[in-house]
Curated annotation (Swiss-Prot):
Pathway: Cofactor biosynthesis; tetrahydrofolate biosynthesis; 7,8-dihydrofolate from 2-amino-4-hydroxy-6-hydroxymethyl-7,8-dihydropteridine diphosphate and 4-aminobenzoate: step 2/2; Cofactor biosynthesis; tetrahydrofolylpolyglutamate biosynthesis. Binds 2 Mg(2+) ions per subunit. Monomer. 7,8-dihydropteroate binds at residues 116-119, 147-149. This is Dihydrofolate synthase/folylpolyglutamate synthase. It catalyses: 7,8-dihydropteroate + L-glutamate + ATP = 7,8-dihydrofolate + ADP + phosphate + H(+); (6S)-5,6,7,8-tetrahydrofolyl-(gamma-L-Glu)(n) + L-glutamate + ATP = (6S)-5,6,7,8-tetrahydrofolyl-(gamma-L-Glu)(n+1) + ADP + phosphate + H(+); 10-formyltetrahydrofolyl-(gamma-L-Glu)(n) + L-glutamate + ATP = 10-formyltetrahydrofolyl-(gamma-L-Glu)(n+1) + ADP + phosphate + H(+); (6R)-5,10-methylenetetrahydrofolyl-(gamma-L-Glu)(n) + L-glutamate + ATP = (6R)-5,10-methylenetetrahydrofolyl-(gamma-L-Glu)(n+1) + ADP + phosphate + H(+).
Length: 411
């Protein structure tokens, strides 16, 4: 039984106990959303799906829209430190009391209907958005697309950043199957911006079935990287000598193309001023420089490959140490392999979740001669800190939870 005086932390503990084994089905979720008056929105809806780059694409959309004077809501997941990070209104998180109130509203209407944690908090987020007069709402898909809780809302424009191999136990073991799930966000006669160059056949099939209008990279829009600037090309505009960004250029370009396909007017001077300032915690976040201490949420092979490229760009002259925690359902070898020839010593440990790869499981994948398997991420980091010199680097990565645990340390 929920007490009306529950704090946010108590609410979250309660929500974590909700049905974890329920078969994903949006029917009941839509029923509750309709009762709450959430299915129809006056706001323009962006829905962002894809394997990598969802968060950074959302961040670019949010920044450019805000700096252009629009009222913007953002729903994203997971959070790194505090739950309130998941919902932003006009660039700011909300007070805990507002989240608690939205939870109470969902619980009153739920009346025993089984929901997962993510389904519950998605309804709560939509309640919060409804209370504000927003020009647009940006919804970051949690997992896949077709059966994701965010997909109860019909988007005006959807985005698929890319298609990679991840969450194979749920989405399928190949790109064709994974694309089929992500394309669940497609809507009839609506545009979907595609940032993937190697488009699986299933994406074309579903677009044809749903009469979705695909706007594809390298066909309808494109970008190119130069030495210290980049260019963007779209059917209506060409932008040259754009400043370098702190987020992946693929994310910046995908967001930019999406805005040009939307009803929103973004001035070129805003793009040039704002796009280089977009940053996202946990995405190649530099904590210090002497030595380099860098955190990154890379948790699949594609993201690990990008992380490896970013490490090359900063020209570390000394040794590189890695502090790594990974979930057991991930492609562990695929995550560590892109960095294998860079890492002098691995410090790895289980994470604080039942989904973690255990010490025994980690031992199977990491090289014996230069790996220490510790009890926790905190101990792993402290061990690395003993060895590191000012010309060296420590890279903390492998999962959102790895970065979250590290950033929560009182060090």
């Amino acid at each position: 039984m929920i007490n009306k005086n529950y704090s946010l932390s108590l609410w979250l503990k309660y929500l974590e106990q909700l049905d974890k084994k329920r078969i994903y089905n949006l029917t009941e979720l839509k029923f509750l959303a309709k009762k709450l008056g959430l299915l129809k929105s006056e706001s323009f809806i962006f829905t962002v799906a894809g394997t990598n780059g969802k968060g950074t694409t959302c961040a670019v959309l949010e920044r450019l829209l805000l700096d252009s004077g629009y009222q913007v809501g953002l729903y994203t997941s997971p959070h790194l430190i505090n739950f309130v990070e998941r919902v932003r209104i006009n660039g700011f998180v909300l007070h805990e009391e507002e989240h608690i109130d939205s939870f109470q509203n969902v619980e009153l209407v739920r009346n025993g209907v089984l929901l997962t944690y993510f389904e519950f908090i998605t309804l709560a987020a939509l309640i919060l958005f409804k209370r504000y007069s927003l020009d647009c709402i940006i919804l970051k898909v949690g997992l896949g697309g077709r059966l994701d809780a965010t997909n109860i809302i019909d988007s005006d424009i959807s985005i698929i950043t890319n298609i990679g191999i991840d969450h194979t136990s749920i989405l399928g073991r190949d790109r064709i199957s994974i694309a089929r799930e992500k394309c669940g966000v497609f809507r009839k006669n609506k545009i979907s911006v595609i940032g993937e160059t190697d488009i699986p056949c299933s994406m074309y099939q579903i677009a044809k079935e749903k009469k979705t209008i695909l706007k594809k990279i390298d066909i309808d829009w494109s970008w190119e990287k130069k030495r210290n600037y980049w260019n963007f090309f779209h059917s209506t505009i060409q932008l040259y000598n754009l400043p370098e960004t702190q987020v992946p250029l693929s994310s910046a370009a995908t967001a930019l193309s999406t805005l040009y396909y939307s009803r929103f007017k973004i001035k070129e001077k805003i793009i040039r001023k704002s796009i280089s300032n977009v940053q996202l915690p946990g995405r190649f976040q530099v904590i210090s420089t002497f030595p380099y201490i860098i955190v990154d949420v890379a948790h699949n092979p594609n993201a690990a490959f990008y992380l490896s490229q970013k490490i090359d760009e900063i020209n570390i002259t000394g040794k590189i140490y890695a502090v790594v925690g990974i979930l057991k359902d991930k492609d562990i070898l695929g995550i560590i392999d892109p960095l294998a020839n860079k890492i002098h010593h691995w410090f790895t440990a289980p994470l604080k979740t039942i989904r973690t790869a255990t010490k025994h499981e980690l031992k199977k994948f990491f090289p014996i001669h230069n790996t220490s398997i510790l009890k926790s991420i905190e101990i792993a980091y402290k061990k690395a800190l003993i060895l590191v010199k000012k010309e060296d680097a420590i890279i903390i990565f492998g999962s959102f939870l790895t970065v979250s645990e590290f950033l929560s340390l009182k060090i």
